Amino acid sequence: MQVDEQRLRFRDAMASLAAAVNIVTTAGHAGRCGITATAVCSVTDTPPSVMVCINANSAMNPVFQGNGRLCINVLNHEQELMARHFAGMTGMAMEERFHQPCWQNGPLGQPVLNGALAGLEGEISEVQTIGTHLVYLVAIKNIILSQDGHGLIYFKRRFHPVRLEMEAPV
């Protein structure tokens, strides 16, 4: 199998891996930016740590690294349009994305999306290059939780809501 063919088959296989949709944001002396990401994973709860993978060619990387802090905003099912904005699918400029009334600064000064299922503010403790991506290890320092809303996942190259069904009485 050729390398390009294997790469495409791998990408097709990963499209079958349903993943939560997040907007990873940062603000500080290096600037403010954000990106939609599905390659986000918990690492450990002691101490709370998360892994975020971003394409090494992304113009956001110097901003994330320069600020040294970020927020992982776990989107709810009604925030698909915001996910599209931060994925660059709508053509909205970066600063305009943050001028929406749904943003506030968290205790670490990071952009936190109101209504997100969770906002995890943290400090970047390590960055490694693996193939085409940078892997950020983030030590979580502040957690904001919402009890409202359902999940939003990306599956087969499309966004899908994930709704909790009512449990039937036993």
UniProtKB/Swiss-Prot annotation:
Q: Name one GO molecular function term.
A: NAD binding
Q: Which Gene3D superfamilies match?
A: Electron Transport, Fmn-binding Protein, Chain A (2.30.110.10)
Checking InterPro entries in the record gives:
Flavin_Rdtase-like_dom, HPA_mOase_red, NADH-dep_flavin_reductase, Split_barrel_FMN-bd
Keyword list (alphabetical) reads: Aromatic hydrocarbons catabolism, Flavoprotein, FMN, NAD, Oxidoreductase
- As recorded in UniProt, its EC number(s) are 1.5.1.36
Name the family the entry cites. Belongs to the non-flavoprotein flavin reductase family. HpaC subfamily.
For this entry, the protein name equals: 4-hydroxyphenylacetate 3-monooxygenase reductase component
Species this chain originates from: Salmonella typhimurium (strain LT2 / SGSC1412 / ATCC 700720)
Give the taxonomic lineage as stored in the record: Bacteria, Pseudomonadati, Pseudomonadota, Gammaproteobacteria, Enterobacterales
